[in-house]
């Protein structure tokens, strides 16, 4: 394990997203290696304006943690039922976060199988943002967890940076604003990566870039 700190995430969201690939998120008995992520910026006043982001229209009670320091957990419900897990990025006061879209279970496999009984294969266990949150047992009460605090119930462990040649990038899934911005990053070698689905409200066609 490389010697790392939260300072490695005090960067723009796409750079942080690439840095998170290969990292491990631990919660209780379960650990998941990150293989697919999406970067999200902030409001129009910040350095990374992003109308597709929850913080795109400014600070609210819901997204407040996105405007805080890097390395904290931003959790929200999608469609009122799926717990989505994000890691905050960038300097304190500047909104940014990375959505954790998919991972490979590396510890606690039996626990996760119990949480995801409908998964057809182990590669499905933490594939997709909602399944990722379920696999780790993360709930709304975990909002704001400091992921680099050794005493925290949920912890993030960064691995050595991966070569750019191992990482693919392309448009984000299901967003209608800035639909072609290539801020989704994944490891093509992993069977746990989710399929790309373009929002029906997004204009035009998308381009997915291979590893480079």
UniProtKB/Swiss-Prot annotation:
BP terms from Gene Ontology: base-excision repair
Gene3D superfamilies: Methylpurine-DNA glycosylase (MPG)
One Pfam family, short name: Pur_DNA_glyco
Entry keyword set: DNA damage, DNA repair, Hydrolase
Catalytic EC class: hydrolase
Signal peptide: none
Domain of life: Bacteria
Alphabetical list of SUPFAM superfamilies matching this protein: FMT C-terminal domain-like
GO molecular function, one term: DNA binding
EC identifiers of the protein: 3.2.2.-
Similarity comment: family membership: Belongs to the DNA glycosylase MPG family.
The protein, known as: Putative 3-methyladenine DNA glycosylase
UniProt source species: Nocardia farcinica (strain IFM 10152)
């Amino acid at each position: 394990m490389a010697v790392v700190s939260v300072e490695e995430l005090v960067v723009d969201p796409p750079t942080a997203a690439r840095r998170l690939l290969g990292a491990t998120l631990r919660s209780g008995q379960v650990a998941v290696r990150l293989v697919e992520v999406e970067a999200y910026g902030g409001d129009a006043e910040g350095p990374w304006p992003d109308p597709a982001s929850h913080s795109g229209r400014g600070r609210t009670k819901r997204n407040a943690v996105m405007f805080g320091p890097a390395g904290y957990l931003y959790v929200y419900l999608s469609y009122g039922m799926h717990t989505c897990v994000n890691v905050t990025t960038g300097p304190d006061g500047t909104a940014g976060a990375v959505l954790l879209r998919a991972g490979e279970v590396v510890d606690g496999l039996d626990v996760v199988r119990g949480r995801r009984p409908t998964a057809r294969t182990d590669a499905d266990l933490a594939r997709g943002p909602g399944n990722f949150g379920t696999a780790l047992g993360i709930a709304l009460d975990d909002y704001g967890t400091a992921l680099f605090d050794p005493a925290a119930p949920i912890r993030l462990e960064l691995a050595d940076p991966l070569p750019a040649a191992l990482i693919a990038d392309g448009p984000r899934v299901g967003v209608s604003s800035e639909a072609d911005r290539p801020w989704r990053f994944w490891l093509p070698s992993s069977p746990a990566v989710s399929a790309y689905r373009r929002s029906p409200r997004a204009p035009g066609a998308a381009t997915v870039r291979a590893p480079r």
